[in-house]
Amino acid sequence: MECIELDNKIKITDVHDLDLAQTLDCGQSFRWKLQDDGSFHGVAYGKSVTVSLDKTDMYIENATADDFKNIWYSYFDFSLDYGKIREEISTIHPVLNEAAKYAPGIRILRQEPFEALCTFIISQNNNIKRIKGIVERLCENFGTRLDDGEFAFPTAETLAKLSPDDLAPLRAGFRNRYIIDAAQKVANGEVKLDSCFTLDYEDARAELMKITGVGKKVADCTLLFGMHRIEAFPIDVWMKRAMEKLFPNMNGDDFGQYAGIAQQYIFHYSRMHPELF
């Protein structure tokens, strides 16, 4: 893999095991929008970029080689060999083998921890389209405006100064109270997000569950997508259905150290095959 600087964009060569739609529009992150030309425009780590793929060449507009080194290499999880991981986990169960073959371009995004926490609080009893709308309004109302008119995700410190009523423009309902509680506990150090990278898994989950409204599912999603705890195995309605129907008598522990990656293959496969249920 090589990063080449071009005019206001970078080209990354030899990119494998990445499908932008499967990765950016599958319920991991809620700030990416599909463009008419097949590219995706989004904001992460305070950077507004457009990402496209041409076979094994990836282009990131409005980015530099330093941005790739410091942000995007990690964000797209290029340090992991997903081909080898698929080979390993596909031996666990025939249905998982089928699911991994169905969407081999899924990668686990390494998102900002606080953004992952808030967006999965918002995801409770919600659909992807509505989640994206709430997240967009949260950023437009309380995030820092970027040069191109987009908005960064607001910081915990910014949101901690607000009340649930201040979030009324989001139209997020009961989730407003949870967002403010999360921001306040992160900002004042009661909940230490950085510790969740290294704590034992159950302790990391318990740390996040100090926040009002954060149960196991939101905590597991935050750990998987915000801390890259790829042993996490979030269970939502789709996954509960999939486990009962396709993997009876199995649980997340049965999928090993890459359970979170297996979960994404199963989640996507289940959503795309409703006839199985």
Show which residues each predicted segment covers.
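HhH-family (HhH-GPD) DNA N-glycosylase catalytic core used in base-excision repair
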Residues: 1-277
